[in-house]
Amino acid sequence: MKILILLVAFVAAANAVSLYELVKEEWNAFKLQHRKNYDSETEERIRLKIYVQNKHKIAKHNQRFDLGQEKYRLRVNKYADLLHEEFVQTVNGFNRTDSKKSLKGVRIEEPVTFIEPANVEVPTTVDWRKKGAVTPVKDQGHCGSCWSFSATGALEGQHFRKTGKLVSLSEQNLVDCSGKYGNNGCNGGMMDYAFQYIKDNGGIDTEKSYPYEAIDDTCHFNPKAVGATDKGYVDIPQGDEEALKKALATVGPVSIAIDASHESFQFYSEGVYYEPQCDSENLDHGVLAVGYGTSEEGEDYWLVKNSWGTTWGDQGYVKMARNRDNHCGVATCASYPLV
């Protein structure tokens, strides 16, 4: 009996050691892949604990996915060592505030209202990437500048449609220079305010001439390096998914804002994203709608480009549920620049 007890204890200890070694191996690989460095051993222990907890949540969700209880899969990514509250405060920077009244010396013009094209049969699927109107996925880093990436993406698409040339535009130009228009750099902003700044400023510099830094810096716009201009902006009727669909089909990529405040979005990997807790009014993240379609399982979706690099989501993209009561607010604050 004593021998049996000793054997059980030995096996339990061996399994514990093996599990610990496995976690450490995965942790070390995670740090290497995502270039993680911590200020102290104490911080690393805390980050490891958060990482393990997030892995557990992801595994439980994916079990439900395998059972057909979820429509999308999650995956460990570079944000796996962050508390969800940290993550949201760091990267979600869409500020839906009516700051027009408090702006001094700057006039934010009223948007042009989108008029749906008459007698036009829109296709069942659209993907502006295939038409060459979308630049590669970018990475905003630890800066709440999502709004600037959404704005440049929409203008890049409109500029391409007008000129046939795809030019990557400078988010840093918007972060540094559009403050008096109501934007707050790494602390958030709005795409419409960015479009207004670009119009009044006479353009926005190219990404090459004004590279991204992921910090608030001094404005050094160069009029000789302008990559695109706009004449104002068009707002899609609030909450109208059908109007958003027609705009995507006939105009090009559209700036949208969504509720990305959920852990499920932090670790999204593939599939059609539907989060029951999503809000259609409390929006916190600016992204770019570049198309729409229907999955093999019959789920309608919006094809959305994010600005968290290619290691997040499906190579940097997410399929958001479509025709589900304006899910996550995809059509609540949709707009595009006039060129």
Curated annotation (Swiss-Prot):
<feature type="disulfide bond" description="Interchain (between heavy and light chains)">
    <location>
        <begin position="278"/>
        <end position="328"/>
    </location>
</feature>
<dbReference type="InterPro" id="IPR025661">
    <property type="entry name" value="Pept_asp_AS"/>
</dbReference>
<dbReference type="GO" id="GO:0006508">
    <property type="term" value="P:proteolysis"/>
</dbReference>
<dbReference type="InterPro" id="IPR025660">
    <property type="entry name" value="Pept_his_AS"/>
</dbReference>
<feature type="disulfide bond">
    <location>
        <begin position="143"/>
        <end position="186"/>
    </location>
</feature>
<keyword id="KW-1015">Disulfide bond</keyword>
<dbReference type="InterPro" id="IPR000169">
    <property type="entry name" value="Pept_cys_AS"/>
</dbReference>
<dbReference type="InterPro" id="IPR039417">
    <property type="entry name" value="Peptidase_C1A_papain-like"/>
</dbReference>
<dbReference type="GO" id="GO:0008234">
    <property type="term" value="F:cysteine-type peptidase activity"/>
</dbReference>
<feature type="signal peptide">
    <location>
        <begin position="1"/>
        <end position="16"/>
    </location>
</feature>
<dbReference type="InterPro" id="IPR038765">
    <property type="entry name" value="Papain-like_cys_pep_sf"/>
</dbReference>
<feature type="glycosylation site" description="N-linked (GlcNAc...) asparagine">
    <location>
        <position position="95"/>
    </location>
</feature>
<protein>
    <recommendedName>
        <fullName>Cathepsin L-like peptidase</fullName>
        <ecNumber>3.4.22.15</ecNumber>
    </recommendedName>
</protein>
<dbReference type="InterPro" id="IPR000668">
    <property type="entry name" value="Peptidase_C1A_C"/>
</dbReference>
<feature type="active site">
    <location>
        <position position="306"/>
    </location>
</feature>
<feature type="propeptide" description="Activation peptide">
    <location>
        <begin position="17"/>
        <end position="121"/>
    </location>
</feature>
<feature type="active site">
    <location>
        <position position="285"/>
    </location>
</feature>
<keyword id="KW-0788">Thiol protease</keyword>
<keyword id="KW-0378">Hydrolase</keyword>
<dbReference type="InterPro" id="IPR013128">
    <property type="entry name" value="Peptidase_C1A"/>
</dbReference>
<keyword id="KW-0865">Zymogen</keyword>
<keyword id="KW-0732">Signal</keyword>
<feature type="disulfide bond">
    <location>
        <begin position="177"/>
        <end position="219"/>
    </location>
</feature>
<comment type="subunit">
    <text>Dimer of a heavy and a light chain linked by disulfide bonds. Interacts with cystatin; the interaction results in inhibition of cathepsin L-like peptidase activity.</text>
</comment>
<keyword id="KW-0645">Protease</keyword>
<comment type="function">
    <text>Proteinase exhibiting preference for Leu, Val and Phe residues at the P2 position.</text>
</comment>
<dbReference type="Pfam" id="PF00112">
    <property type="entry name" value="Peptidase_C1"/>
</dbReference>
<keyword id="KW-0325">Glycoprotein</keyword>
<dbReference type="Pfam" id="PF08246">
    <property type="entry name" value="Inhibitor_I29"/>
</dbReference>
<comment type="similarity">
    <text>Belongs to the peptidase C1 family.</text>
</comment>
<dbReference type="InterPro" id="IPR013201">
    <property type="entry name" value="Prot_inhib_I29"/>
</dbReference>
<feature type="active site">
    <location>
        <position position="146"/>
    </location>
</feature>
